[in-house]
A protein has these predicted regions:
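Active-site-adjacent loop/helix surface patches within enzyme catalytic domains
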Residues: 2-109
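Cell-envelope/ECM-targeting effectors and their regulatory/trafficking segments
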Residues: 54-57, 87-105, 109, 119-222
């Protein structure tokens, strides 16, 4: 196991999401679901494949379903009334992810979002997900500081690839990968454009991608 991929359910209710995730005909599943009150339910054993990522890639991993644990957070998503993730839900997520990290010997940077691994198709867990907060617990990374830099698309794509993004995925390209990066590290302004702030953040995240950085916040972050 190499990754933990975070999702939102994107359905009207927890019951509807659970029904879909346990329906063999739906051809979609996840290892865990965490309700808004923090109740966590295991659906698929960690040593078995769950069908949660779809066409996706991260670093050298092209078969994300076969190399990751998928966690679904109950949230209506952008189609049904996207809303902040409650503290109880995030506390349960942190506890679960720390246990998964310990069981599988995963580094902090192994915790990513669905939109990170599938930037052309997905936007979950979305701009309201508290990436900075969970990085403070050793789940994901957050740059301690950053400096605006002159935009350089070649250098930006090199940095994004070093972080793990895959511009080569079907129907993907620079703008979609940049938007996915912004959704994770600059959620207050997601436009897919390589501006000086985004350029500086790419360099900062790349430099901090092996250890969690617990202080400071990127623009618009929670």
């Amino acid at each position: 196991m190499a990754l933990v991929v975070l999702h939102y359910t994107g359905m009207r209710s927890a019951a509807a999401a659970l029904a879909r995730l346990t329906d063999p005909g739906a051809k979609v599943s996840a290892h865990y679901v965490i309700d808004r009150d923090g109740a966590a339910l295991a659906l698929v054993p960690e040593d078995r494949r769950a069908w949660h990522a779809g066409v996706a890639g991260w670093g050298a991993i092209s078969d994300v379903n076969g190399h990751s644990i998928g966690i679904e957070l109950v949230n209506p998503g952008h189609d049904w009334g996207y809303r902040p993730f409650p503290p109880a839900q995030i506390e349960a997520l942190v506890a679960l992810c720390l246990a998964i990290r310990a069981r599988h010997g995963l580094p902090p940077r192994a915790v990513v979002g669905h939109s990170d691994v599938a930037p052309a198709r997905k936007i979950d867990p979305g701009e309201l997900f508290p990436w900075r907060l969970i990085a403070g617990h050793g789940l994901g990374v957050w740059p301690a500081a950053w400096t605006n830099a002159p935009p350089d698309m070649g250098a930006a794509l090199e940095g994004l690839r070093a972080i793990g993004y895959r511009p080569d995925l079907p129907d993907t390209g620079p703008a979609k990968v940049i938007a996915a990066f912004q959704r994770h590290w600059r959620p207050g302004s997601i436009d897919g454009r390589l501006d000086p702030e985004t350029m500086g953040l790419i360099a900062a995240v790349r430099g901090s991608s092996l250890v969690p950085c617990l202080y400071g916040a990127a623009p618009g972050a929670t």
